[in-house]
Every structure is written in C-alpha cells, then in structure tokens.
Regions:
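Register position in tetratricopeptide repeats
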Residues: 87, 127, 169, 204-205, ...
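Alpha-helical adaptor scaffolds
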Residues: 126-127, 131, 234-311
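TPR/TPR-like (Sel1-like) alpha-helical repeat modules
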Residues: 295-302, 319, 323-346
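Compositionally biased alpha-helical segments
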Residues: 24-174, 185, 196, 204, ...
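Bacterial N-terminal signal peptides
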Residues: 9-21
Length: 357
C-alpha cells in the first residue's frame, strides 16, 4: 500500500495520511472540476480528501472539494449515467441505469471501476430511502456496507452525509451526528458542511433555537477568504438560520438574511440560489405574504431549478399556495410536475399523504 498526503490550498491536511491502492494500478479517467477546466490522465489513487492523477508523467494531487465528478475511460455508459443521476439527486433514475449494465460490460474492468459500480448502487438505494422515507433499513445496509468496505473512497464524505440522513430519518439523531465525524477531519468546506448538517438535525426535531445557534456557528467559522468552497457552505448555513427565524415567527429577520446571501452569491451558484429563494418563500409565507411567496417559489421552479430537492420543495409549496388561492389549474400543473419528476422525494410523499396525516 502507498502512503500519501494531500495538500489543500497550500496547507497540509492535519496529520491525516491515507492508504490507497497500488501505484501501478492506474486507471485512465478525467476529473471534472468545480471552478476550473477538467483534468484527463491516469488516476493513480483516491482517498477521502483527494485524487491523484498522472498527466503525461506529472503527478497532480487534486483536493476533493474542487472535484465535481470523477469519470473513468473504461466504465460502461450506463454506469456513467447512473452516477450522474445520483449526483443530481435522482436515485430512481440511477437504479434504472444500473439495471441496463450488461454483465459482460464489467468483465475485466479496473478495480476503481468495479468499486464505482458498488458506490452507485449503494448511493442509489440509500438516496432513494433517504428521499422517500421508505425502506430505510435497506438504505442503511447498503450505505454502511459500502463505507465499511471502502473506507478510503473519494466518495466517503458524501456517503457519510447520506448515512447521517438515513439515521436522522430513523429518529437516531445522536448516531446521525456521529456519522458526520469523518467530515470534521476533512478540508474546511466539509467541516463547515458537517457543522451545518448537525444544525439540520436540530431543525428536523423542530428545535429551532438550537438549530439557529448551530447554523450561525457554522456560518461564522473561520476559513480562508479565498476558499470559495467554504464560502458556499457558509452561505448555505446562513440560509439555515433564515429558515429557523421563519419558524420562530421572525420572518423579517429571515428576509434580511436571505437578501444578504443573494447579494453574496454569484449567478452560477444555482444550488445556493435555489435554496435561498425557497428560504425567502418560507419567510413570505410566515409573514402572510402569499403572493410574494409564490414569486419566490416560481423563481426556483423556472430559474434556479438544477437541484432536484430545491425544485421539488418549490413545487410542493406552489401546490399549497395555489390551492389556497383558488387557482386549481395551476395547483394541478405543479402537482403533476412534482409527482412525475420527483416521485421519490419527501415533498412528493407529503403531497400524496392524506390531509392531517
């Protein structure tokens, strides 16, 4: 096994060395990056905090927070499509794509590709359970099995987050918080993300004062001003504070926070912008300003709609508001879009549930 250490933005990751696969087992692939052109070469090693890739004889160590996706030259097309679906929050589609992989397509593939199929299967099963609230035990088994077998995967942080979501769904909030511990040993962006996720556990329990305090702590964490990944996570944490303020009957404070996040976000921060307009819609509903809320949710539906969870939430609220506003045709259109496009989300399940359940 090879011992490696990755360096993030000029600073060494605190004493966190990682064991990776044999250096000789190189797999042709490409790193799709968040804010830079992609990198093609031979993938030498992966770990929770980065990927090492050989580009024409030059080794590059790329930090995990700057990587959007890792693709492999020899992977089946359906495997690639399934991973894209997982990344887009579409686990049902991912499972359909996985089913299209012919057994022969995986014969003789490199170990990283075989491992990737295991990841996509576990992420799809776990993601579907977390989104729908159904088959939680199967989701937990899949995710825990994958993490236990692949503790040095570059997908570790994402899978630990998914594990936390599943445990939260089971009402095991202390275990969910513990599942986020590996992120605390990661780069700053993931430490902020873990802190915000723990705040979310309080939010799920309707402990809004506690949640607001923890979200605020995450948003105020000390990070490098040039660390754009951490900045995005801190803006997301601020939106958590805004949602808590709405739940606590302080919509004006929530609006002020959302306005600040919107001003700090770039036009390409579509996920943050979608979450921000949903939070704005929440604040407007809390203030009794239903028409303003509709405008906020429509902004997510029509403009900042790339993140499925954001758009599903917006559609759910539009159904409720248009039903309330005596616009049955619009409500039905939004209802059908939600049920057809995002049938496995908690928002679709809430919509289909009997009133008062």
């Amino acid at each position: 096994m090879r011992l490696c250490r990755f360096f993030l933005r000029g600073a060494a990751v605190a004493a966190w060395a990682c064991l990776v696969g044999p250096a000789a087992a190189q797999t042709p692939g490409r790193l799709i990056l968040v804010d830079a052109p992609g990198i093609s070469g031979d993938i030498v090693a992966v770990s929770p905090i980065g990927v090492e890739i050989d580009v024409r004889g030059e080794a590059k160590k790329v930090p995990i927070e700057s990587i959007r996706e890792v693709t492999f030259a020899g992977e089946p097309q359906s495997l690639r499509a399934a991973r894209v679906a997982v990344n887009r929050g579409q686990p049902a589609q991912a499972l359909e794509d996985i089913a299209k992989i012919e057994p022969g397509e995986m014969d003789g593939v490199d170990q990283l590709i075989a491992d990737e199929l295991e990841f996509v299967k576990a992420a799809a099963v776990g993601g579907q359970a977390a989104s729908s609230g159904e088959n939680i035990a199967a989701g937990l088994k899949a995710v825990q099995g994958y993490v236990g077998k692949h503790p040095q995967t570059h997908h570790l942080f994402a899978m630990q987050e998914l594990l936390a979501r599943l445990l939260s769904r089971s009402g095991k909030f202390d275990e969910a918080a513990a599942a986020l511990a590996p992120l605390d040993r990661g780069p700053p962006a993931y430490r902020v993300r873990a802190a915000a996720a723990r705040a979310g556990l309080f939010y799920d329990q309707k402990k809004y004062d506690d949640a607001a305090r923890e979200y605020a702590a995450a948003a105020q964490a000390t990070t490098d001003p040039k660390d754009t990944a951490s900045a995005a996570q801190k803006r997301a944490a601020e939106l958590g504070v805004a949602r808590c303020r709405s739940r606590l009957g302080k919509p004006d404070e929530a609006v002020a926070i959302v306005d600040r996040v919107l001003a700090a976000s770039g036009a390409d921060d579509t996920e943050v912008l979608g979450a921000a307009y949903n939070a704005l819609g929440d604040a407007m509903r809390a203030a009794g300003k239903d028409q303003d809320a509709i405008i906020a949710y429509l902004t997510v539906d029509l403009v900042h709609n790339k993140a499925p969870e954001n758009r599903a939430e917006a559609l759910f609220n539009l159904v409720e508001l248009w039903d309330k506003g005596k616009s049955p045709q619009r409500a039905e259109e939004a209802r059908q879009q939600l049920l057809q496009a995002y049938p496995d989300t908690v928002w679709a399940r809430k919509l289909a549930a009997p009133k008062g359940s």
